């Protein structure tokens, strides 16, 4: 007996090729894609705009996997100033990822995961200590947003307005699937469509993939997990920086901003006595003056058995003042969901964290 294939593994282009290979007109692919990602059919026989014979062929050869989550897999932040919610999203192969809803300032932002685990092992990030299992496909990325929208509909709290690819994993290691998922989520003819201007992709700074992203035609925002403008310090925090040093990252970001005309966001987590001195701030000033950018400062979010501390208010204020006095565009991002391990760097599923880790 032939094993059924996952129809959601096919990109939009691959669906066109599939339809042509079985003698169907090319437009059938568009109909099928709409049923999958706008109407969100759970069975081929629901696809009434497609001929019965094609529905039967698809049902015989393919299956329609569904991601899922339940109310019991939702954790709410109980702090007075946050309504962040963290969801456990079950994938069809029994793997799972965490997805976060951040309602704030009139927006509903969804933070999506792109990998089960992460292979990059950033020292301040819980996900890296999970190890790495696999990339998500485009459907699994998009369905995280669909499921959160279902949740918002159920509680009467509006629509998803923004998406950040800042959950579990390194998005640019799954670049093809990420690009395909952005296409699904931003299709203006679909039921749920988010402007690409309200979608942000994050990366530790994978240089070849940043170049590919610049040429992809997407108009999404790009955030760089920087965390230090000193090469030695950055490499000690983020092993990937050894392969992609700051000197080369700077050149790539100059080219990226020149090609796209869009600023990048430099994300900088302030860590006590590691990257929070005035000298560190001045190094960041010199780097940031090289290309069009804005700087997003964030506090360290505690992780069990990882011995970092947040910079104190005095050191943080001196750091901020140094950047502002240099004329840089600086925002201080409020962490949402730290009390439920849903903030930046805290996402991890049922994996043992290290007994002790420090720089």
Swiss-Prot record:
| Positions with a binding annotation for [4Fe-4S] cluster | 118, 122, 125
Tell me the ranges covered by the Radical SAM core domain, including all copies.
Answer: 104-339
GO terms classed as biological process: rRNA base methylation; tRNA methylation
Q: What else is known?
A: Reaction proceeds by a ping-pong mechanism involving intermediate methylation of a conserved cysteine residue.
Concerning its family, UniProt says: Belongs to the radical SAM superfamily. RlmN family.
PROSITE patterns given in the database record: RADICAL_SAM (PS51918)
Q: Which organism is it from?
A: Prosthecochloris aestuarii (strain DSM 271 / SK 413)
Class of the enzyme per the UniProt entry, highest EC level: transferase
Question: Under the cellular component aspect of Gene Ontology, which terms does the record hold?
Answer: cytoplasm
- Identify a single GO molecular function assigned to this protein: rRNA (adenine(2503)-C2-)-methyltransferase activity
Describe its function: Specifically methylates position 2 of adenine 2503 in 23S rRNA and position 2 of adenine 37 in tRNAs.
Where along this sequence does the record place binding of S-adenosyl-L-methionine?
A: 169-170, 202, 225-227, 301
Tell me the cofactors it needs: [4Fe-4S] cluster
Q: What is the name of this protein?
A: Probable dual-specificity RNA methyltransferase RlmN
* EC numbers, comma separated: 2.1.1.192
Gene3D superfamilies named in the record: 1.10.150.530, Aldolase class I (3.20.20.70)
Where's the active site on this chain?
98 (proton acceptor), 344 (s-methylcysteine intermediate)
List where the protein spans the membrane: none
Q: Which gene encodes it?
A: rlmN
* Compartments (UniProt record): Cytoplasm
The record ties this protein, via InterPro entries, to: Aldolase_TIM, Methyltransferase_A, RlmN_N, RNA_MTrfase_RlmN, rRNA_lsu_MTrfase_RlmN/Cfr, rSAM
How, per the record, is the cofactor bound?
Binds 1 [4Fe-4S] cluster. The cluster is coordinated with 3 cysteines and an exchangeable S-adenosyl-L-methionine.
Keywords for the protein's UniProt record, in alphabetical order: 4Fe-4S, Cytoplasm, Disulfide bond, Iron, Iron-sulfur, Metal-binding, Methyltransferase, rRNA processing, S-adenosyl-L-methionine, Transferase, tRNA processing
Q: Which reaction does this enzyme catalyse, per its entry? A: adenosine(2503) in 23S rRNA + 2 reduced [2Fe-2S]-[ferredoxin] + 2 S-adenosyl-L-methionine = 2-methyladenosine(2503) in 23S rRNA + 5'-deoxyadenosine + L-methionine + 2 oxidized [2Fe-2S]-[ferredoxin] + S-adenosyl-L-homocysteine; adenosine(37) in tRNA + 2 reduced [2Fe-2S]-[ferredoxin] + 2 S-adenosyl-L-methionine = 2-methyladenosine(37) in tRNA + 5'-deoxyadenosine + L-methionine + 2 oxidized [2Fe-2S]-[ferredoxin] + S-adenosyl-L-homocysteine
* Primary location group: cytoplasm
- Disulfide-bonded cysteine pairs: these are 111-344
